[in-house]
Regions:
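Sec-dependent N-terminal signal peptides
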Residues: 4-13
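Amphipathic alpha-helical scaffolding segments comprising HEAT/armadillo-like alpha-solenoid repeats
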Residues: 26-38, 62-80, 101-113, 134-143
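Short inter-helical turns and helix N-cap capping residues of alpha-solenoid HEAT/ARM repeat scaffolds
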Residues: 43-44, 84-85, 116-117
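HEAT-repeat alpha-solenoid elements in large eukaryotic scaffold proteins
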Residues: 48-59
Length: 143
């Protein structure tokens, strides 16, 4: 009897105790994406890398949907292609992976195959494989 009462209490109280992400209004989401896009386009290395990481975190924590953040895809593609450091390019690759846009995923494949930087290439290859494993889709190429 005690166990039944405990189980019922747990089933009733867990949904109230578990953390829930609050849904941001559309205006705030748009402002957040616009500010992060400006940061990604910045000439400051730390701001570019930090903006890409924050974008990934916000999508990962469900504060932003990948559709909301699609405006930042082109600057992220540019950052992945022309980044000055490995960390900057990796931050862009991870953010593109989290966006899940087919153009970004295809670009990860291109960097994985053709990039001379072994570290960036290996991470892009792993992100490319992970995306297809998580979504149950086919790879376009074996590395």
């Amino acid at each position: 009897m005690k166990t039944l009462i405990i189980v019922l209490l747990v089933l009733v109280l867990v949904p109230f105790v578990s953390p829930q992400t609050e849904q941001l209004p559309q205006e705030k989401r748009s402002a957040i994406v616009d500010n992060l896009t400006v940061g990604i386009k910045s000439t400051n290395y730390g701001l570019r890398t930090g903006s890409a990481n924050v974008l990934f975190d916000l999508i990962n924590e469900s504060y932003l949907q990948s559709e909301d953040a699609s405006k930042s895809m082109i600057p992220l593609l540019t950052m992945l292609e022309n980044g000055q450091t490995d960390e900057e390019r990796i931050a862009a690759a991870v953010a593109l992976f989290k966006l899940g846009n087919s153009i970004g995923i295809y670009r990860l494949r291109g960097v994985a195959i053709f990039d001379d930087n072994e570290r960036v290439s290996k991470i892009c290859k792993n992100l490319y494989y992970s995306f297809h494993k998580l979504n149950g889709t086919e790879y376009l190429i074996d590395f």
